[in-house]
Amino acid sequence: KEKIFVHHENRILIRYTLVDAHSATTLRFRPFLAFRSVREYTHENPQANRDYQLVENGVKTCMYPGYPELFMQLNKKNEFHFDPNWYRGIEYPKEQERGYDFNEDLYVPGYFEVDIKKGESIVFSAGISEISPRRLKQVFETEAEDRTPRDSFYHCLKNSAHQFHNKQE
């Protein structure tokens, strides 16, 4: 499992690679959603919108008014199983150590199922705009190549400095 944020875009990519398998394998991916500010935890509530729409190789949803739609897509055809549930009591020990609230409930709209073969990679995307699933592997590779390695103090400083770059439009 490898995670990477796309530069200058509100999108995370997660790549799963099946290193070894001795039989047919199905990847089941269950996204946990919050739709909240960074310091405001959420708890199970009836205001959460459970609606979703199908998009190419995925779904889009928006839990609350005023938030952007969230597009969740995979680079490969898959099946989305609508199975809405709240996962209660998720805890964040680091936040507890810092003296902050540390407990919340997260909404899971359902799960994606996709067959995966030995040596194959599946890329999952979550972002506020739709993306062509055919581009996901290439975008992941490009972002990974542009990433500063964290193999020395200098590179760690360089990486930290790059986190403050703003894209001017």
Where are these regions (language model features)?
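Acidic, mature catalytic/reactive cores of soluble proteins
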Residues: 1-169
